[in-house]
């Protein structure tokens, strides 16, 4: 990477007792900013730790000396040094007098976005997320140069604080052929964004620091006009935008949706859920946690949907190694590789997983097929399994063996106790709904009892319903609560041993269909056409799960259809 920082021009505006120690400092190439507060010693901040530069305190005269050497401060208390990328920010007292300065070093780092160059070539809108000082503006500046010079696109930069292209009327060469639009007042940024589209015919618009609801709305308007957007926002994780009502529109917005009784039961969720409101303004989101390691969400739409449903999406970690090579890895968000940078998300997802007891996601060829997303009650499955390597692993579906506390409402305790004893299930009945992990009730009683539904909703407890208080229905419900049917007693490795590839593929297809039926009690799943010998193998597997199957159609298109119990 080539770095240009014009550090000497920044040092020229500093008082001599601040400038001289920095000139002689061995680590000045890594200087982040210089902080000068009235009545305090000057401080230099480096990536490792801050250091005091002098024993002398900053006076009014020292601050006035610096202010006179920089441009005028704008409405957001920012100024700059002409033809440089440095930013000078001021702190004022109640009378409006400057009592502190933050002199931040601006650097043009050429080659820093090689890690995401393939994403730029796709033409999708990109949102960069990260805490202050992590390098978002530096990355945006280099993106502007690459898009305008190397990809020859018409690029317009909305430079509200003159931080991307520097202070003055002539933009810094680091942005290449990109054009820069300055903003007279920071609160008018959204108007300048719309003006850029209407007047200057850009192919790409670059915005730094989207922070208000009007700016988020303007970004959405620009995206709907077919212009590629590259923007930055403060926030460590993509989940931060979901919780931020001001910026939620950037990822499509979040809304409460009330489901019908049947739909809520089929999904295994409460009736009131969160869903994405519209298509996101940015198709790609990048979390910058470190200057050399970025986490990429290539499909924001799918990632947001998975997060709202309580699933753990796959994340893509891109890292620049010491030899300059780029290492790209894909992990579930629960991976230890991203644990240090996504701990808050992990805690939220793990708690959801413990409460809902959903099936674990199944990984096939580095992709995750979420069985809860297959909503059609009569569907063909092989579109997800044809020409896909089969993962033969007897631990691919695990049953949670922890003890579950069950609250039974309007049901016979004697019947439930007899089923638990006969099957030796890890379930304890409780009379306190607050301590329960699940609720089992008659369907007719649940519809009439709004208080029960409210308590379950507030405590995030799933209500399992049955039609009648019979032993078979209670048995099926208890098995569903424990996900017992998701793991057969069959030894999967032994079953597939000495089988040919197409035979294993057919068994894998049947197994996936069985799990869909277990999740959606009323589902009917149709398999793809197979020979009589293969259909017999599938029949034997289905019988082991105590489900019904029937062949229909004419040869050679005869196939199985699997029914619930």
From Swiss-Prot:
Keyword vocabulary terms for this entry: ATP-binding, Chloroplast, Nucleotide-binding, Plastid
Family: Belongs to the ycf45 family.
Pfam families reported for this sequence: R3H, Spore_III_AA
Lineage of origin: Eukaryota, Rhodophyta, Bangiophyceae, Bangiales, Bangiaceae
Name listed for the protein in its UniProt record: Uncharacterized protein ycf45
InterPro entries the record matches: AAA+_ATPase, P-loop_NTPase, R3H_AAA, R3H_dom, R3H_dom_sf, Spore_III_AA_AAA+_ATPase
Domain of life, source organism: Eukaryota
CDD domains the UniProt entry points to: AAA, R3H_AAA
Single GO cellular component term: chloroplast
């Amino acid at each position: 990477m080539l770095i240009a920082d014009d550090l000497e021009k920044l040092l020229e505006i500093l008082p001599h007792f601040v400038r001289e120690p920095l000139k002689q400092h061995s680590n000045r190439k890594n200087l982040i900013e210089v902080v000068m507060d009235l009545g305090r010693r000057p401080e230099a901040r480096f990536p490792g730790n801050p250091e005091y530069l002098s024993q002398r305190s900053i006076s009014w005269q020292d601050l006035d000396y610096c202010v006179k050497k920089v441009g005028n401060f704008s409405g957001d208390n920012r100024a700059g040094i002409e033809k440089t990328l440095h930013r000078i920010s001021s702190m004022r007292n109640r009378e409006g007098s400057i009592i502190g300065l933050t002199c931040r070093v601006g650097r043009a780092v050429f080659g820093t976005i090689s890690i995401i160059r393939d994403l730029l070539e796709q033409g999708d809108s990109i949102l960069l997320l990260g805490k202050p000082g992590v390098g978002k503006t530096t990355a945006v500046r280099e993106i502007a140069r690459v898009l305008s010079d190397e990809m020859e696109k018409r690029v317009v930069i909305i430079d509200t604080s003159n931080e991307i292209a520097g202070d003055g009327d002539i933009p810094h060469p680091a942005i290449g052929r990109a054009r820069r639009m300055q903003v007279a007042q920071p609160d008018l940024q959204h108007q300048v964004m719309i003006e850029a589209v209407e007047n200057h015919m850009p192919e790409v618009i670059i915005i730094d620091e989207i922070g208000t609801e009007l700016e988020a709305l303007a970004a959405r308007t620009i995206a709907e006009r077919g212009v590629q957007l590259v923007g930055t926002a403060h926030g460590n994780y993509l989940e931060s935008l979901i919780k931020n009502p001001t910026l939620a529109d950037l990822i499509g917005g979040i809304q409460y949706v009330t489901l019908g009784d049947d739909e809520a039961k089929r999904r295994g969720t409460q009736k009131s859920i969160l869903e994405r409101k519209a298509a996101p303004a940015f198709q790609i989101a990048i979390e910058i946690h470190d200057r050399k390691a970025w986490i990429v969400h290539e499909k924001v739409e799918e990632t947001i949907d998975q997060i709202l449903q309580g699933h753990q999406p796959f994340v893509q970690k891109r890292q620049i190694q010491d030899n300059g090579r780029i290492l790209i890895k894909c992990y579930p968000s629960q991976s230890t590789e991203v644990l240090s940078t996504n701990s808050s998300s992990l805690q939220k997802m793990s708690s959801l997983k413990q409460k809902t007891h959903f099936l674990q996601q199944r990984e096939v060829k580095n992709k995750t097929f979420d069985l809860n997303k297959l909503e059609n009650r009569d569907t063909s499955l092989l579109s997800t399994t044809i020409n896909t390597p089969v993962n033969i692993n007897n631990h691919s579906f695990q049953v949670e063996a922890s003890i579950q506390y069950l609250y039974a409402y309007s049901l016979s305790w004697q019947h439930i106790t007899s089923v638990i004893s006969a099957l030796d299930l890890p379930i304890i009945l409780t009379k306190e709904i607050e301590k329960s992990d699940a609720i089992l009730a008659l369907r007719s009683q649940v519809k009439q009892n709004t208080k029960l539904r409210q308590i379950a909703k507030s405590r995030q407890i799933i209500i399992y319903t049955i039609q009648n208080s019979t032993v078979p229905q209670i048995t099926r419900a208890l098995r569903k609560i424990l996900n017992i049917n998701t793991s057969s007693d069959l030894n999967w490795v032994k079953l597939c041993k000495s089988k040919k590839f197409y035979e294993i593929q057919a068994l894998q297809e049947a197994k996936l269909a069985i799990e869909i039926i277990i999740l959606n009690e009323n589902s009917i799943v149709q398999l793809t056409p197979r020979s009589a010998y293969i259909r017999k193998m599938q029949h034997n597997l289905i019988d082991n799960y105590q489900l019904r199957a029937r062949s229909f159609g004419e040869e050679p298109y005869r196939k199985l259809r699997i029914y619930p119990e």
